[in-house]
Curated annotation (Swiss-Prot):
Organism of derivation: Gluconobacter oxydans (strain 621H)
Tagged with keyword Repeat: no
Recorded family membership: Belongs to the imidazoleglycerol-phosphate dehydratase family.
Listed HAMAP family: HisB
Protein name stated in the entry: Imidazoleglycerol-phosphate dehydratase
Length: 198
């Protein structure tokens, strides 16, 4: 097991340059700068409600659009999550959360399975929130799930306000991840799988 449950990564391409540090057993502190204001707001909520400490500095080709930056942050965040979780001994593995924000209600279900998958059932009533394209939320969570090697289901059960839907979704994922990475005191450090490996 990675006792510190911490990872620091740097990834540079011709499109983005990203440095990210993640501590799973944190205090919900964050220092985030992606260059996209609303995305920063969502990542801050993810750290706060997941109990993670998150530092992020991303420079991307925002003169084109936000796609490369958002997707690549998802990749690096997923890689850091996978590294920090270590061999998965003693974790709960599964997490589930329903989180409301006024009229919006989102449900997130997580399995730290080693089998990457995203089931996305979220529809936004408008194409942008601030400067961020709402279609990029799916790209972020897909990149995260694929790189973290987790199965993630996110469903919006109700909502009419795009900001509320996005924030409810990020908070639901945060709460589900918080449960999934937590230690099961009855497991005696075992791998949470009948196969003995994840």
């Amino acid at each position: 097991m990675n006792e510190s449950r911490h990872a620091r990564l740097h990834r540079a391409t011709s499109e983005t340059d990203i440095t990210l540090a993640l501590t799973l057993d944190g205090q919900g502190r964050s220092d985030v700068d992606s260059g996209i204001g609303f995305f920063d707001h969502m990542l801050t909520a993810l750290a706060k409600h997941g109990g993670f400490d998150l530092e992020l500095k991303a420079k991307g080709d925002l003169h084109i659009d936000g796609h490369h930056t958002v997707e690549d942050v998802g990749i690096v965040f997923g890689q850091a999550f996978r590294q920090a979780i270590g061999d998965k001994r003693g974790i709960e593995r599964f997490g589930h959360a329903l989180v409301p924000l006024d009229e919006a209600l989102c449900e997130a279900v997580v399995d730290i399975s080693g089998r990457p998958y995203l089931a996305w059932n979220v529809v936004f009533p408008r194409e942008k929130i601030g400067t961020m394209d709402t279609e990029l939320f799916e790209e972020f969570f897909r990149a995260f799930a694929m790189s973290a090697h987790i199965a993630l289901h996110l469903t919006c059960k109700s909502g009419t306000n795009a900001h509320h839907i996005a924030e409810s979704g990020f908070k639901a994922v945060a709460r589900a991840l918080k449960v999934a990475v937590s230690h099961d005191p009855r497991s005696a450090g075992a791998i949470p799988s009948t196969k003995g490996v994840l």
